């Protein structure tokens, strides 16, 4: 009798294992979709397209990038949260969508912990602090001195209230005990244009946006908000080198799915993301934007997300930054 039970148990286990392997082998059997909550042409969008191209090659299925823009990333993120948890809908996510907005909005239509499954962190980018050409400073230290001499008068553009450029400015003010006039714009292009025309004094931006403007003499790059000097602007000293110890600011780029996808499907996605993060096309794309490849698996990304939420949640609460 005991032998019969053992045989039946073994047979049942074998069937389950074969079923799981079959599901793993069959996925994907139709096109996949990557939701991007930002407009076409930006860092998130172009990064998602590189990921999509590589996934399509590896999976042998088309991968469509769908831009669902609006509400500082909330529209696209809500759409991703409500998608079927079958592994066919992914979202390319950033600090705004998954670490800032949850603390910024009183009424948010998604919950990061409840609605999403981290798959992988792929890359991180850091800001440089750029200033208009006519501003009488040449480095971060001189900017801090000028700001302390005239509290609240020097203007700094951001991509919008609660954007990574905004919270980086707020963090910079806290660390340096300074006060600037924050001028939020509706996106990257208007903020950079305001800097270029002299409408604002400075802005935290990604280096690839302003490196050409620096070379033409239209802006100055005062410092790199990174732990080490950036490859795109190797002559620009870090904030740490200029006395603002350990200061970093920027964004990051990862991939999530709706929570509840089958474990074998998640495992296959995670495996492919690890390969993409090390692929020449992805690394070349990252290098061209001054973005650092920083792969972390699902567990590592989940831990990173928790720390990012703690960091930005505390700052947003202390500063009373909110959007109704």
Question: What do these predicted regions represent?
Answer:
Residues 24-114, 153, 161, 177-204, ...:
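N-terminal (or domain-start) structured segment
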Residues 1-11:
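Bacterial N-terminal signal peptides that target proteins for export
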Residues 97-107, 171-175, 202-236:
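A ligand-binding cleft/hinge motif common to bilobed small-molecule-binding domains
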Residues 29-31, 178, 215, 241, ...:
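An extracytoplasmic/periplasmic, membrane-proximal ligand-sensing/linker region
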Residues 82-88, 103-190, 239, 252-285:
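Hinge/capping helix and adjacent helix->loop/strand transition within the periplasmic-binding protein
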Residues 92-97, 158, 187-188, 205-210, ...:
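Beta->alpha turn/N-cap motifs
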């Amino acid at each position: 009798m005991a032998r019969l039970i053992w045989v039946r148990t073994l047979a049942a286990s074998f069937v389950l294992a074969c079923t799981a392997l079959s599901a793993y082998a069959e996925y994907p059997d139709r096109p996949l979709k990557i939701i991007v909550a930002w407009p076409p042409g930006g860092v998130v969008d172009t990064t998602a397209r590189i990921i999509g191209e590589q996934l399509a090659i590896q999976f042998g299925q088309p991968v469509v990038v769908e831009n669902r823009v609006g509400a500082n990333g909330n529209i696209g993120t809500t759409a991703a949260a409500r998608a079927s948890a079958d592994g066919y809908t992914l979202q390319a996510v950033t600090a705004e969508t998954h670490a800032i907005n949850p603390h910024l909005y009183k009424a948010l239509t998604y919950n990061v912990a409840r609605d999403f499954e981290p798959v992988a962190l792929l890359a991180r980018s850091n800001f440089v602090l750029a200033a208009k050409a006519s501003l009488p400073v040449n480095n971060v230290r001189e900017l801090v001195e000028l700001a302390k001499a005239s509290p609240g008068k020097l203007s700094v553009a951001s991509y919008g209230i609660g954007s990574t450029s905004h919270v980086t400015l707020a963090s910079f003010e806290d660390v340096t005990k300074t006060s600037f006039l924050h001028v939020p714009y509706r996106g990257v292009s208007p903020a950079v244009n305001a800097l270029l025309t002299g409408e604002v004094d400075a802005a935290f931006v990604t280096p690839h946006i302003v490196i050409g403007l620096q070379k033409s003499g239209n802006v100055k790059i005062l410092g790199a908000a990174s732990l080490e000097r950036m490859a795109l602007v190797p002559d620009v000293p870090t904030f740490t080198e200029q006395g603002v110890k350990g200061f970093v600011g920027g964004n990051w780029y990862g991939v999530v799915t709706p929570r509840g996808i089958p474990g074998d499907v998640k495992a296959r996605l995670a495996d492919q993301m690890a390969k993409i993060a090390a692929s020449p096309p992805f690394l070349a794309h990252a290098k061209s934007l001054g973005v650092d490849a920083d792969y972390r698996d699902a567990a590592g990304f989940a831990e990173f997300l928790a720390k990012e939420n703690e960091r930005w949640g505390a700052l947003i609460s202390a500063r009373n930054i909110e959007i109704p």
